[in-house]
Curated annotation (Swiss-Prot):
Transmembrane segments: none annotated. PANTHER family: UNCHARACTERIZED PROTEIN YQGE (PTHR30327), UPF0301 PROTEIN YQGE (PTHR30327:SF1). This is UPF0301 protein Cag_1601. The lineage of its organism: Bacteria, Pseudomonadati, Chlorobiota, Chlorobiia, Chlorobiales. One of its GO terms (cellular component) is cytosol. Belongs to the UPF0301 (AlgH) family. Disulfide bonds: none annotated. InterPro entries: AlgH-like. It comes from the Bacteria. It holds the Pfam family DUF179.
Length: 188
């Protein structure tokens, strides 16, 4: 079932924690991979909202009432963003068609504060998830991860609690059973 999952992983794909992943940073997480090459991998957790708002955490974003998200356990004091406006934000890197990572923060602030860009077109993250060369491959061999296709609907979804099960279930077949498994299998 998990054969060749690692070979399917590229920038722009989703990385899904397997049901056996119990490590607290990644338990039942859905990540968007933004970089994946021989040097390592980098992505952002999509389904871990934090309890404070962007305007409370990032200077210059006074009108952004959306929640900030935990991007991952690496460099947790760094700010990153995913957005759909590569046409307006310079220095953005296209991750998949219509979805961009990063860009000019001052432009983002201006676009949001003037209403040219809507908060639903961007997500902000504290930190990121990162793996050194070979590390993620080893985790795949241990059965820690699955892959899936990314869509803007998943990336900008507010259904955080159901995101993992819905995304795993959408893979079909035996993954539908996995998606319905209890969080702590030994507790049922």
């Amino acid at each position: 079932m998990i054969v060749n999952e690692f070979e399917k992983l590229t920038a722009g794909k989703l990385l899904l924690a397997s049901a056996t992943m119990l490590e607290s940073n990644f338990k039942r997480t859905v990540l968007l991979m933004c970089e994946h090459n021989e040097e390592g991998s980098l992505g952002f957790i999509l389904n871990r909202p934090l309890e404070f708002k962007v305007r409370e955490a990032i200077h210059g974003f006074n009108d952004v009432d959306d929640v900030l998200h935990q991007g991952g356990p690496v460099q947790v004091n760094s700010i990153h963003f995913l957005h759909s406006r590569g046409d307006l934000i310079h220095n953005s890197q296209e991750v998949l068609p219509g979805i961009y990572w990063g860009g000019n923060k001052d432009e983002v602030s201006y676009l949001l504060n003037t209403g040219v860009m809507h908060p639903s077109e961007i997500r902000f993250y504290l930190g990121y998830a990162g793996w050194s060369a070979g590390q993620l491959f080893s985790e795949f061999e241990e059965g820690a991860w699955y892959t899936a296709e990314a869509t803007p609907d998943v990336i900008f979804s507010d259904a955080y609690e159901r995101m993992w099960s819905r995304t795993v279930r959408a893979k079909g077949g035996a993954y539908q059973l996995i998606a319905n498994s209890p969080e702590l299998p030994g507790m049922n």
